[in-house]
Amino acid sequence: MFLFGKQKTPKEVLRENQRNLNKSMREIDRERVALQNQEKKIILDIKKMAKQGQMNSAKIMAKDLVRTRYHIQKFYEMKTQLQAVSLRIQTLQSTQAMAEAMKGVTKAMITMNRQMNLPQFTKIMMEFEQQSDKMDMKEEMMNDTMDQVMEQDGEEEQSQEILNQVLDEIGIDLASQLVDAPTTVGTSVASKHQVNSG
């Protein structure tokens, strides 16, 4: 297929498929609108036949109406399926863009590593790790201290009672944040306990 021409990139293939899908969806919409207009006309014809007493003709038209509505529904389903495929293509395009961005970052990192003074970089990283370890130790000690204070000062029932008060005051929004920010909630509970104790 590409013996005498340039092979298309994955990005170009995705874009072409996206264009074809959009074109197909527009054609489906046109057909569906035409069928809906036909549906309205059939309904008017059925009413007209019924008023004239032509019940056999009205029944035939009613069957046409059923078929027309069936096709309209099918066009809706087809468009929904194409939209799902379109969304998948957009996701693939995003993934492709992400991969290209990662390639760029990797190249930049390689260049940076070549240009950087390795001993100096190693020293900086070691200092960073040491300071990070110190911070982790301090945070762990603070958490242990807070846990001990809470165990000595407040029991399970009191903690639950305080938490319920906080939830009642702030509302449902805090409940949704419990999973995302447990540390914040713990601080709020501890603050509330101190206020109540004082």
Curated annotation (Swiss-Prot):
<dbReference type="GO" id="GO:0000815">
    <property type="term" value="C:ESCRT III complex"/>
</dbReference>
<dbReference type="GO" id="GO:0045324">
    <property type="term" value="P:late endosome to vacuole transport"/>
</dbReference>
<dbReference type="GO" id="GO:0015031">
    <property type="term" value="P:protein transport"/>
</dbReference>
<dbReference type="Pfam" id="PF03357">
    <property type="entry name" value="Snf7"/>
</dbReference>
<dbReference type="GO" id="GO:0032509">
    <property type="term" value="P:endosome transport via multivesicular body sorting pathway"/>
</dbReference>
<dbReference type="GO" id="GO:0005771">
    <property type="term" value="C:multivesicular body"/>
</dbReference>
<protein>
    <recommendedName>
        <fullName>Charged multivesicular body protein 2a homolog 2</fullName>
    </recommendedName>
</protein>
<keyword id="KW-0472">Membrane</keyword>
<keyword id="KW-0813">Transport</keyword>
<keyword id="KW-0653">Protein transport</keyword>
<dbReference type="InterPro" id="IPR005024">
    <property type="entry name" value="Snf7_fam"/>
</dbReference>
<comment type="subunit">
    <text>Probable core component of the endosomal sorting required for transport complex III (ESCRT-III). ESCRT-III components are thought to multimerize to form a flat lattice on the perimeter membrane of the endosome.</text>
</comment>
<feature type="coiled-coil region">
    <location>
        <begin position="11"/>
        <end position="42"/>
    </location>
</feature>
<keyword id="KW-0967">Endosome</keyword>
<keyword id="KW-0175">Coiled coil</keyword>
<comment type="similarity">
    <text>Belongs to the SNF7 family.</text>
</comment>
<comment type="function">
    <text>Probable core component of the endosomal sorting required for transport complex III (ESCRT-III) which is involved in multivesicular bodies (MVBs) formation and sorting of endosomal cargo proteins into MVBs. MVBs contain intraluminal vesicles (ILVs) that are generated by invagination and scission from the limiting membrane of the endosome and are delivered to lysosomes enabling degradation of membrane proteins.</text>
</comment>
